Amino acid sequence: MLTLEIKDKVVLVTGSNRGIGKSFVEKALELGAAKVYATARNTGSLADLAAANPERVVLLNLDICNQAQVDAVAAAAQDVDVLVNNAGAGGGGAIVAANNEAPKRMEMDINYFGTMKMAVAFAPIVKAKGGGAIVNILSISGLCSFAFAPGYSASKAAGHSLTQALRAELAKQNTLVIGVYPGPIDTDMAKHLPFDKASPDSVATHVFNALATGEEDVFPDPFSVEFVKQLRIDAKAVEKANGASA
């Protein structure tokens, strides 16, 4: 079983300027990471954290859909042990009734293709460090579509399949590939959802624990734990319940 302790390791987090991503940066520092590359399209909100940890936090501007920026960040971060693919987006809107392809394409570009670009760029880097780990922040909606977010669900389903494919392909280089499937988390993206929400910190804590134990599929909050339990009992019933949420 592949495992990895964060202490003295180098971590790169995408979408780290707020929410779950920022919690990953803070938790990695708390657990003794040697260095954290905190990346986002705008890293301004992390300036104080970087100033307080000048030897351990490196801020890098990154749009994961921009191949040139991905390549530049990979060139600047050749010492990474753990890649956390956290950057994501949701546009909402029904499929037929909305009749608007643009937000669905945006979701797929960021949540699937952007994640893939980062994995391709950093797989050789973590290999050179002994295998390392790639962590993909996905969603329970990638396991069964939610009718109020069909494009987001489809993009996260693609991310789920990508994670499985990466796990198989990178096993020979001893890279631990983890899929994380949160339910509603207390972030800006989920603020409109009428559910109890777990904290971003709890997601980061669960993921770093999973790295240490080699857990490949992480359900980091009570909602996601119960959701996957019901999915395993009766997937069709869950599908119908999710469809009623439109």
Which residues fall in each region the model found?
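Conserved glycine-rich cofactor-binding loop
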Residues: N17-R18
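Conserved glycine-rich Rossmann-like NAD(P)H-binding loop of the short-chain dehydrogenase/reductase
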Residues: L29-D48
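Active-site helix of classical SDR
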Residues: A119, S155
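Residue(s) in the substrate-gating loop at a strand-loop-helix junction
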Residues: S139
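Conserved mid-core segment of classical short-chain dehydrogenase/reductases
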Residues: G90-R105, F148-G151
